[in-house]
Amino acid sequence: MAFNDCFSLNYPGNPCPGDLIEVFRPGYQHWALYLGDGYVINIAPVDGIPASFTSAKSVFSSKALVKMQLLKDVVGNDTYRINNKYDETYPPLPVEEIIKRSEFVIGQEVAYNLLVNNCEHFVTLLRYGEGVSEQANRAISTVEFVTAAVGVFSFLGLFPKGQRAKYY
């Protein structure tokens, strides 16, 4: 199942090893990968800031630490769902391979970039062998749109108000 249809605030479902876990934080989603026995693998800022405060810190971080933690500790007071949303586009690796790859990187410091190498990229790389992030793609599109809009308005600002109509 690519998406957990039984998702609710009270019962997000029982994850299986290799499942992607989407944690809903205020203003963004954090991603982890379920390993089994209540544990997940995820990345967090190197200085060990609690999970609920990592958003602001991660914007300025260039490094992250790969951690194996209890799912309940990563989620904290937030909610989560099982969301293997890329399964139709990228076939998942065998579970044994996902777990082996995950165990290999636990405790390592990795490069981090909010737009090109974030927590969603990290867990999708483990599950599919390819780092993908819809959240980052949306952010990049927003930045591109704002940049283009600023450019247009800056360009229009070069012309006196009366001359602008002549160029349309």
UniProtKB/Swiss-Prot annotation:
The active site is at residues 30, 119. Coiled coil: none annotated. Its EC number is 2.3.1.-, 3.1.1.32, 3.1.1.4. Residues 160-168 are lumenal. GO terms for cellular component: cytoplasm; cytosol; endoplasmic reticulum; lysosome; membrane; mitochondrion; nuclear envelope lumen; nucleus. The keyword NADP does not apply. InterPro entries: H-rev107_PLA/AT (IPR051496), LRAT_dom (IPR007053). One of its GO terms (biological process) is phosphatidylcholine metabolic process. One of its GO terms (molecular function) is phospholipase A2 activity. Belongs to the H-rev107 family. This is Phospholipase A and acyltransferase 1. It comes from Homo sapiens (Human).
